[in-house]
Each structure stands twice: as structure tokens, then as C-alpha cells.
Curated annotation (Swiss-Prot):
Keywords: Ion transport, Magnesium, Membrane, Mitochondrion, Mitochondrion inner membrane, Transmembrane, Transmembrane helix, Transport. This is Solute carrier family 41 member 3. Residues 1-36 are annotated as: Disordered. Residues 1-19, 27-36 have a biased composition (Basic and acidic residues). Its main location: mitochondrion. The keyword Transferase does not apply. Na(+)/Mg(2+) ion exchanger that acts as a predominant Mg(2+) efflux system at the mitochondrial inner membrane. The lineage of its organism: Eukaryota, Metazoa, Chordata, Craniata, Vertebrata. The keyword ATP-binding does not apply. SUPFAM superfamilies: MgtE membrane domain-like (SSF161093). InterPro entries: SLC41_membr_dom, SLC41_membr_dom_sf, SLC41A1-3. It comes from Mus musculus. It is found in: Mitochondrion inner membrane. GO terms for biological process: mitochondrial magnesium ion transmembrane transport. It is a multi-pass membrane protein.
Length: 488
């Protein structure tokens, strides 16, 4: 099977080949045959002992995982809270008021940043944990090719995100202004390009630093990226779009800049070709990112339709937090499961305890298996995390969001429901992609973060709507009781 030799080298680098025994040999491009039940037909020599899936003494426990995750998670939440405050501020800028599709563009563009950086962080974390970046020459090769691939993806999908936002916005617009189309496309491409470059360099520094200090990069890389990612992306988008809006009379400026950034694509392709395994991402990795962008665009449509309505006051502030927390936690879990499979199995071969594609939710959240332990830790962070971030937002911008007890309860329930769904789907999608000999780092995280954006935006809008209904009903009952108590 393609990739078996590479995986064997990774296992040898980790010193775990003895524990696993010899790796199975398959013909190139062929997978193990599936059983009649749809599960893998795995020989006894290929099965991983069930005990190895449990957290052994001296390895990662819930306390260790929680200790490594909680600080980056809180930092990420602070960054997401500030991103929400910025979005609430930017929505009043002239360019956001005049170019309505800019607000529709926010979730897919922020989600694109998240998809690219989280998949990059996950790939680099897997490379670090399997010892591939310990060699200086190999490290340079992996880093440069990964950065180049991210730049190509950011440029192309940034343009597609603008097109998707325009298509969704066309339904509600009567006229089609080409100057606004050029502004939206150029702002999207530049934002995606610069944000991907800045965050990619940050990810590289974090993963290499974590490796040197003996910290698992899977636990800290994606949260730290999220702590600055939304801030950087929103700031660049607002500044670039405002700049081009102020120079809208110079008709050739936006097309010229957009073409200039697109013209850099061959350079990134040349750099990426230096590492053939990474180059495969450009051949087969487009569909997950584009589909995730489309899913996020529907979340952006919900945001643009609700953000200016009185009953949804606070939607702009809380959307980055709700979407970001869910996407953050599921990216951590996906990266951990992916690393686990890279270290303990080979592509196409699932460990015996993971052979079911649709596992029992109780196994996902209540077993002693190491991935179940991490799922519980991440789930336990949701409620206290959201309370802290909500409190910070109320301190800074209390008048922009309702703080009724009913809404807070609905908000917390929505956050838990979102993360439970995403963590379960993380386990399912990783198993399915690994069964197909695909890398979960590249194929699962985009789907899950895109779905997290749509779920987060939808559930948050539902919270505001239910709170408005319940408060309206309570006010109506209070008014009726006052009228009844008034003497004739």
C-alpha cells in the first residue's frame, strides 16, 4: 500500500515498532478487504491489542491532557472574544454597510483560515510526534513545502469564498455592482494570503518549540492558532476592504492587486514540488476545503440576515466565540486521533477497538481508551470556557449582548450540543478516512470546522430567537396580569 514504508519509518522513529510487530505488506494502491458487515478484515498480526488503546501508567492522563489544553484553550477563547468585539465594531464601518456581502464572507473566510492552519498544525504535530522533523534537512523540507501548499490553497479558496458569498448574496440583491465584486474578491484573496502566511509561520514556531520542550503539539498548536487567527483575519479583511473602498474610483486597482497575488501561485507550486508527499495534498486535498468553505458560507448567510435585527442583538459579538470554541476543540481531538493512528497503525488498517464506523456514543465519551479520555476533558471545558468568555464580553461590551438567565442557559446548552456532535463526528470521520487510506489531518478537520461554523451560527441564532420568544411571552403575561389587577 502506498505510504506503508513512510509509516514504518515513522514508527521506527518513535521506537514503537517492537510493540506493534512487523507492518503488513500490501500491493500499491490496494486496501485490506472489508468484511461482509462493512468492517475491515484484519488479520491477527495486524490487530492492535485493545489494552494498548487504554491510557497506560506514565502516559497521558486526563489531568495531563487538561493541564496542556486548558491554558491554550483559554488564550484562544480570549482571542475569539476580542474577535467578536472587533466584528461588532467593524459592522458599523461604511464598507460593511454598503457591501453587504462582506458580512456573509466573514464565516467562510475565518473558517478557511481555521481549516488551513488547523490542518497545517495537525500535519506538523503528527510529523513532530513521529520524529520526522528532528532531522534538520528534513525539517526544512517539510516546513517549506507545507507553507507553500497552504499559500496555494489560501489564494484559490479565498477567491472561491468571495464568489460563493456573491452567489448567496445575489438572491437578495436587485443589482449587480462590478466594483463591489472586485472589492470583495481582492479583499478576500489578500486576507486569506496574508493570514495564512502569518499563522503558518506561527504554527511552525509553536510545533518546533513544543517538540523541544517535550509538550504534545496536538494539545496546544490549534488553540494558540485560534487565539490570534480570527483577530488577524478579521483585522486584515476590515483594513483591506476599507482601503479599497476608499479608492473605489480607481477602477483598475482591485483587479491589478488580485491578479498580482494569483500570479504568485506558480512560485508556491514550484516550492511544494520539492516534497512529493505534500504535493499530493494539492491533488487530492481540494474537495474537503472547498466543501467546508461552502458549508461555512451558509453560516455566513445566517449571520448576515440576523446581525442587524433587534431580536438578534449580540449576534456579531458571540458568533466568533461559539463557532471558534467548537472548531477548536474538535480540531484538537481530530489531531490527537490522527496522531494515534499514525503511530499505532497503518493507512487502511483500523485497530480492533476502532473497527466500527458508527461507534456507540458511550464508548466515545465513557470508556478508558485514551481518545475517550481526551474527549471527556475537551467536553468538560465547554461550559466553564463559555462562561468565562461570555463574562469577558459583558465586561467590555455589556450593552451589545443580552445577559438574561434564560439566554445564558440556552447559550450554554447550545455550546454543549455543538461540541458533543462534533466530537462524535470526529471519531466517525477519522475512522472512515483512515479506512480509505486517507490522511485525517487533511480530510477531516475541514469538514468538521465547516460544520462547526454552521452548527454554531445556527444554534446561536436559535438561542436568540427562543430567548426573544420566551421574554416576549413573559412580558405579555406580565402585561395581562397588570390589566386584570387594575380595578375598573
Amino acid at each position: 500500500m502506498e505510504g506503508t514504508e513512510a509509516r514504518q519509518r515513522r514508527l521506527e522513529g518513535c521506537g514503537r515498532l517492537k510493540e506493534l510487530g512487523p507492518l503488513p505488506s500490501h500491493d500499491a494502491g490496494r486496501l485490506p478487504k472489508a468484511s461482509e458487515e462493512g468492517h475491515l478484515a484484519v488479520s491477527e498480526s495486524q490487530l492492535v491489542d485493545a489494552k494498548s488503546l487504554e491510557a497506560p501508567p506514565g502516559r497521558e492522563t486526563s489531568l495531563i491532557i487538561g493541564f496542556q489544553v486548558v491554558i491554550p484553550f483559554l488564550l484562544a477563547g480570549v482571542g475569539l472574544s476580542w474577535a467578536g468585539l472587533l466584528l461588532n465594531y467593524f459592522q458599523h464601518w461604511p464598507v460593511f454597510k454598503d457591501v453587504k456581502d462582506l458580512m456573509t464572507l466573514v464565516p467562510p473566510l475565518v473558517g478557511l483560515k481555521g481549516n488551513l492552519e488547523m490542518t497545517l498544525a495537525s500535519r506538523l504535530s503528527t510529523s513532530a510526534n513521529t520524529g520526522q522533523i528532528d532531522d534538520r534537512q528534513e525539517r526544512y523540507k517539510i516546513i517549506s513545502s507545507n507553507l507553500a501548499v497552504v499559500q496555494v490553497q489560501a489564494t484559490v479558496v479565498g477567491l472561491l469564498a468571495a464568489v460563493a458569498s456573491l452567489m448567496l448574496g445575489t438572491v437578495s440583491h436587485e443589482e449587480f455592482d462590478w466594483s463591489k465584486v472586485a472589492l470583495l474578491c481582492t479583499s478576500s484573496v489578500i486576507t486569506a494570503f496574508l493570514a495564512a502566511l502569518a499563522l503558518g509561520i506561527l504554527m511552525i514556531c509553536i510545533v518546533i518549540g513544543a517538540r523541544k520542550f517535550g509538550v504534545n503539539p496536538d494539545n496546544i498548536a490549534t488553540p494558540i492558532a485560534a487565539s490570534l487567527g480570527d483577530l488577524i483575519t478579521l483585522s486584515i479583511l476590515a483594513l483591506m476592504s476599507s482601503f479599497f473602498y476608499s479608492h473605489k474610483d480607481t477602477w483598475y486597482l482591485t483587479p491589478l492587486v488580485c491578479v498580482g497575488f494569483l500570479a504568485l501561485t506558480p512560485l508556491w507550486l514550484f516550492i511544494a514540488k520539492q516534497n512529493p508527499p505534500i504535493m499530493k495534498i494539492l491533488k487530492y486535498g481540494w474537495f474537503p476545503i472547498i466543501l467546508a468553505m461552502i458549508i461555512s458560507s451558509f453560516g455566513g448567510l445566517i449571520l448576515s440576515k440576523t446581525i442587524s435585527k433587534h431580536e438578534f442583538k449580540g449576534m456579531a459579538v458571540l458568533t466568533p466565540v461559539m463557532c471558534g470554541v467548537g472548531g477548536n476543540l474538535v480540531a484538537i481531538q481530530t489531531s490527537r486521533i490522527s496522531t494515534f493512528l499514525h503511530m499505532w497503525s497503518t493507512p487502511g488498517v483500523l485497530p480492533v477497538q476502532m473497527k466500527r464506523f458508527w461507534p456507540n456514543p458511550c464508548f466515545i465519551f465513557c470508556s478508558s481508551e485514551i481518545n475517550s479520555v481526551s474527549a471527556r476533558v475537551l467536553l468538560f471545558l465547554v461550559v466553564p470556557g463559555h462562561l468565562i468568555f461570555f463574562y469577558l464580553i459583558c465586561l467590555v461590551e455589556g450593552q451589545s449582548v443580552t445577559n438574561s438567565k434564560i439566554f445564558i442557559l440556552l447559550y450554554l446548552v447550545a455550546g454543549v450540543v455543538q461540541v458533543v456532535i462534533l466530537l462524535y463526528l470526529a471519531e466517525v470521520t477519522v475512522r472512515l478516512t483512515w479506512h480509505q487510506a486517507l490522511d485525517p489531518d487533511n480530510h477531516c478537520i475541514p469538514y468538521l470546522t465547516g460544520l462547526g461554523d454552521l452548527l454554531g451560527t445556527s444554534l446561536l441564532a436559535l438561542c436568540f430567537f427562543l430567548d426573544w420568544l420566551l421574554r416576549g411571552r413573559a412580558n405579555l403575561q406580565e402585561l395581562v396580569s397588570e390589566l386584570v389587577s387594575v380595578p375598573p
